[in-house]
């Protein structure tokens, strides 16, 4: 009983974390938003079940359906069953499809497994569920899952799928099987290829009118044999003998959640003959089939893979000014998990790119991880009914602005500080954007090098800077004085690569100021355009003023 309570608490905690933040909508706004999304999902359902086509990726559909359920719970609306098909002309299942409960994580699975024995793991094949009924050794009927109790008659379609045995013998001669009709794949690696909208493709082929040779691109994975042999090994052997070989190949005995996690990770990265979206753990001991009911299976659970892409709600649109003066747009998100990373922000790009995406707070966007784990936007999957977009700042900044602090220069000024403190420039370890903001807010820097004048006492008394860290920071600031001349010039934003600057062999400020355009133009990777930028940079009044200030501080290379 205690274990069951622990499982319940785990599930409730997971659900509450997922549903904790409800939109701050008025009742009228909530009704409008829920109604719009409800209508869209109904349209997708109609397309899926009546036309056999899908206008939306499976993963997006699943996540937006979950979002609708969340909103309905937030505002006391009646929830809907996901993908409930029409029941016109439906056929009763000899044995009900129970569905499978999802485990939130490995801990929840471990609690579930603790009170059970003789457990087995199978891939959660991504396709469309079906009942296969054999009578007197022949395929008698095939029924779509439907609502679990009734489904559509798919017999004629399934008879055209060559991978489904049409005749069986022995224990299966009079049997009812449940499984997944799937799209045959050769070497499908889930980690790399994702879901490829497999479920919708299978549904499309099965719902399409007329017989089609394309049905031979389908096969079946049997995952249940109600009232079959008591021993799982016997069950698997008989299924394999009858032609359902995949079940035996991809069913493994497991003792604990660690073993399940190992197999789950293996199948996530392995070449498989089908698309999967997780694993199913099931007990060999099952109740008699007459007790099977939709939503009431306690002998099996699923542990799904984390989606390659997540639907995230945009909470705010923010603008940032980089050190070069370019304005970039960032979307703040309701947190989502991707590959064990908590994603709360995603870079949209330029203002123009943001306007092309047409993203506003309240919209739902599809986010995935690009190279090196950087979040990216794949699509805008849902736009809110009421959309208010912020006004971007005026484009008054460029590569020669904001070396000196001012109210309008706040963001570019901070970006310059972050840049000069980076490893490739002055290498000021232990301070990032938050630290620079704290220092500037307290000590009101005049320009980007004002931090050189801070005393140990000032650093120690800076709110937001730990006292234990202030001495280390002062030491870093003093060490910066010993950095080579070229590093300081880079900190000043000279429009050259480090390689070009090193090739110039410039070792003093006075030498640099007297160098002509032709000199800069001959440097590797520079060219006439970049050379003119260097001339414009070194003749800028703010740059000259900074050079004089560094000379007064006796920084190497700037002395008269």
From Swiss-Prot:
Q: Which InterPro entries match?
A: DNA_ligase_AS, DNA_ligase_B, DNA_ligase_CS, DNAligase_adenylation, DNAligase_N, NA-bd_OB-fold, NAD_dep_DNA_ligaseB, NAD_DNA_ligase_OB
Q: Which Pfam families match?
A: DNA_ligase_aden, DNA_ligase_OB
Which domain of life, per UniProt? Bacteria
Protein EC: 6.5.1.2
Q: Which residues act catalytically here?
A: 124
**GO terms, molecular function:** DNA ligase (NAD+) activity
Name the chain's protein: DNA ligase B
Query: Which organism's genome codes for this protein?
Result: Escherichia coli O81 (strain ED1a)
The organism's lineage is: Bacteria, Pseudomonadati, Pseudomonadota, Gammaproteobacteria, Enterobacterales
């Amino acid at each position: 009983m205690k274990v069951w309570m622990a499982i319940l608490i785990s599930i409730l905690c997971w659900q509450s974390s997922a549903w904790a933040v409800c939109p701050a909508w008025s009742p009228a706004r909530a009704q409008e938003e829920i109604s719009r999304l409800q209508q869209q999902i109904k349209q997708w359902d109609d397309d899926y079940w009546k036309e056999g086509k899908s206008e939306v990726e499976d993963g997006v559909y699943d996540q937006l359906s979950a979002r609708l359920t969340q909103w309905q719970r937030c505002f006391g609306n009646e929830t809907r069953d996901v993908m409930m098909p029409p029941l016109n002309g439906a056929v009763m299942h000899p044995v009900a499809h129970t569905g499978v409960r999802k485990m939130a994580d490995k801990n929840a699975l471990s609690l579930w497994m603790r009170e059970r024995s003789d457990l087995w793991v199978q891939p959660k094949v991504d396709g469309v569920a079906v009942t296969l009924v054999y009578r007197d050794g022949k395929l008698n009927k095939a029924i779509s899952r439907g609502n679990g109790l009734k489904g559509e008659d798919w017999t004629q379609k399934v008879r055209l799928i060559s991978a489904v045995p049409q005749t069986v013998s022995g224990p299966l001669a009079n049997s009812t099987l449940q499984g997944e009709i799937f799209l045959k794949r050769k070497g499908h690696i889930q980690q790399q290829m994702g879901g490829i909208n497999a479920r919708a493709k299978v549904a499309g082929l099965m719902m399409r009118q007329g017989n089609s040779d394309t049905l031979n691109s389908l096969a079946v994975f049997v995952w249940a044999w109600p009232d079959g042999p008591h021993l799982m090994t016997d069950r698997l052997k008989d299924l394999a003998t009858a032609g359902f070989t995949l079940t035996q190949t991809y069913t493994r005995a497991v003792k604990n959640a660690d073993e399940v996690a190992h197999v789950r990770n293996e199948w996530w990265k392995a070449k498989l003959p089908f698309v999967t979206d997780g694993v199913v753990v099931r007990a060999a001991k099952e109740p008699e089939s007459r007790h099977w009911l939709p939503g009431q299976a306690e002998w099996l659970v699923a542990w799904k893979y984390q989606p390659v892409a997540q639907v995230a709600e945009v909470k705010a649109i923010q603008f940032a000014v980089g050190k070069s003066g370019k304005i970039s747009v960032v979307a703040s998100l309701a947190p989502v998990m991707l590959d064990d990373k908590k994603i709360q922000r995603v870079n949209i790009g330029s203002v123009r790119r943001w306007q092309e995406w047409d993203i506003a707070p309240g919209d739902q966007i599809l986010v995935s991880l690009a190279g090196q784990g950087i979040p990216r936007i794949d699509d805008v999957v849902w736009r809110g009914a009421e959309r208010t977009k912020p006004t971007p700042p005026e484009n008054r900044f460029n590569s020669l602005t904001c070396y000196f602090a001012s109210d309008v220069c706040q963001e570019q000024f901070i970006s310059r500080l972050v840049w000069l403190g980076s490893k490739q420039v002055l290498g000021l370890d232990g301070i990032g954007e938050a630290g620079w903001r704290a220092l500037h807010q307290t000590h009101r820097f005049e320009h980007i090098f004002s931090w050189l004048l801070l005393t140990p006492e000032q650093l120690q008394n800076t709110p937001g800077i730990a006292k234990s860290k202030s001495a280390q920071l002062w030491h870093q600031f003093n060490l910066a004085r010993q950095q080579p001349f070229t590093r300081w010039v880079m900190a000043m934003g000279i429009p050259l690569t480090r390689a070009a600057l090193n090739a110039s062999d410039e070792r003093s400020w006075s030498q640099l100021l007297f160098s002509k355009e032709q000199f800069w133009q001959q440097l590797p990777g520079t060219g006439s355009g970049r050379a003119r930028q260097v001339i414009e940079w070194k003749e800028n009044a703010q740059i000259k003023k900074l050079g004089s200030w560094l000379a007064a501080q006796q920084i190497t290379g700037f002395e008269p």
